[in-house]
C-alpha cells in the first residue's frame, strides 16, 4: 500500500467519491436488486445523492491510497453510512480503516444500518465490535435494514 490519506469530500472531489459509491453500490447490490434498478446508480446520480447527504449535515470522507481514490464513508452525528470500497480494492483493510476513522468522528456511540442480505458488510462490522440491536426497517418481503451499534 502507498501513502494513504482520508480527505473531506467537497465540490472538488465529489465526482471521485460518487464514482466509488456508484461502482461499489452496483457490485454490492447486484444479487439483491433488479438489473434495471442497479443500472440507475450512475456516477451522476450518486453525485446528487452525496450532495443531498452533505446538505443534511453529513460529512463524507474519501480514502486515497497513493494517487488512487479507493473508498468512502459518511458520518452524520452518531450514524456511519455509505461505507464503500472499490471491489478490486476490497480485502486490503480499507473498509476497516474507513470504519475506524468514522467511529472517531461520531458524536456518540457509533451506529449504522446494513442490509440483511449484505453478509460481507455484516461480518466486517461484527469483526470491528458492532452488534445487532434488534431494530429493523423492512424494505420488502425479503429485504430489511438492520441497525448495528458499537459495543464497548
Label each PLM-derived region with a short phrase.
Residues 4-19:
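A short beta-loop-alpha structural element at the N-terminal edge
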